[in-house]
Amino acid sequence: QVTLNLSRAVDDSIQEAVLKVTLTLEDKDVYYYTRIEQNFNRSARECLNFAKSIHEKTFDKQYAEELEAYLEPNEESDNTTLQTVNIHSNISHLQWGDLNPQVSTDVDWSIKECNTVYTSLLARYQVTCTGDSGEVETYNVKEFFRVRCNAGQMYLLDYSRTMNQIFNGNK
């Protein structure tokens, strides 16, 4: 593991730059390119805390009214399946319908983009729940949030969640 201290790598007058990392393996060089930006007092922590709060409240029906305020339900969403849920879904689907899943792993949070307008975050985790046949089933879940913080007010700009069942060959 290598840690790069980039605090002084980019002049304050430069807002965005390309970082090139070269890894030399025997006789070959491997290149990795990424974008780095200056962080001028952005609200990534507030956006992450907001997304975590929404994530947790989807598992508790008592927060239905609060969560409903962030949804934009319309015909763009397929409210017949819990496999894909988005900001256009109804509150029942956002809150897992009658599935009653239990988070069975740590939730892995990552910031995908952070700029002056919004922050995009991704949560990855697994849930277990009882399936139609009465057996415990496990699902991989990805939850995407696009959040804006403006003058202390939080806005959910986009949301999507997908879940895919993990195949169990023993059943």
Residue ranges: model-predicted function:
Residues 47, 51, 66-69, 124-140, ...:
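N-terminal secretory signal sequences
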